[in-house]
From Swiss-Prot:
Belongs to the universal ribosomal protein uL2 family. The keyword Ribosomal protein applies. This is Large ribosomal subunit protein uL2. It comes from Laribacter hongkongensis (strain HLHK9). Part of the 50S ribosomal subunit. Forms a bridge to the 30S subunit in the 70S ribosome.
Length: 275
């Protein structure tokens, strides 16, 4: 992969920085693994906005990605690496020895023609998926289950990875990129390596329209609103918040803890912001 600056033929092109990957498949995706994706523009079944700043954007299909990796003991060959508009990471199309095809999150360094395998006996190689109990301490992993058999939930975005720190009894300790250390059952599965497309965070879209293509609408500052619309609103001329920064509903916006799940608090060994 390489970062490419675009020739500044216009103001909208001047700031563009693209991530170019010549190994990406240039054709259509694998049709049997596509599903229709309905765009709701952040509205619920009543038509009310439940998530702001969503709407528009280019139409696309959902790619069904295999997050469970439960097809054990059968070698799969990587047919190609594809772009996925639904996530920051790229996806790899696997063809198993019995002819079945599945998409997985493409790890860093995985290329077409490589072989991967799932199961407890799988070797420690990038792209292989196996239970955490069989992975050596100190290994970098991604696509980690939080409950056995539920499917990967942790470290799925571009460039993400988790360090396996230790195993104590039935649980393993993982250090996330945020600095959080949490426990996960050793029967949960994880994939060896880190997620590919790690240069995704270095790209620059260059213009507002490119953000709109992705279904993201503009964000209006609270201080630019009227008092009826936001706690920061109102005032004569340009003014600041005049108070602790809050959301439109009055929740403190900076540093306020909003986690409220006591049932799983004991799984977090060290919070991400603790010193």
């Amino acid at each position: 992969m390489a970062l490419v600056k675009v020739k500044p033929t216009s103001a909208g092109r001047r700031a563009v920085v693209k991530v170019v990957n010549k190994d990406l498949h240039k054709g259509a995706p694998y049709a049997p693994l596509l599903e229709k994706q309905i765009q709701n523009a952040g509205r619920n079944n009543n038509g009310h906005i439940t998530t702001r700043h969503k709407g528009g954007g280019h139409k696309h299909h959902y790619r069904v990605v295999d997050f469970r990796r439960n097809k054990d003991g059968i070698v799969a060959k990587v047919e190609r690496i594809e772009y996925d508009p639904n996530r920051t990471a790229h996806i790899a199309l696997l063809c198993y020895a019995d002819g079945e095809r599945r998409y997985i999150i493409a790890p860093r360094g995985l290329k077409a023609g490589a072989e991967v395998v799932n199961g407890a006996e799988a070797p420690i190689k990038a792209g292989n998926c196996l239970p955490i109990r069989n992975i050596p301490v100190g290994t970098t992993i991604h696509c980690i289950e939080m409950q056995p058999g539920k499917g990967a939930q942790l470290a799925r975005s571009a460039g993400a990875s988790v360090m396996l720190l230790a195993r104590e009894g039935s649980y393993a300790q993982l250090r996330l990129r945020s600095g959080e250390i949490r426990k996960v059952h050793i029967d949960c599965r994880a994939t060896v390596g880190e997620v590919g497309n790690e240069e995704h965070s270095l790209r620059k879209l260059g213009k507002a329209g490119a953000t709109r293509w992705r279904g993201i609408r503009p964000t209006v500052r609270g201080v630019a609103m009227n008092p009826v619309d936001h706690p920061h609103g109102g005032g004569e001329g340009r003014t600041g918040e005049g108070r602790v920064p809050v959301s439109p509903w009055g929740t403190p916006a900076k540093g306020y803890r909003t986690r409220n799940n006591k049932r799983t608090d004991n799984m977090i060994v060290r919070r991400r912001h603790s010193k």
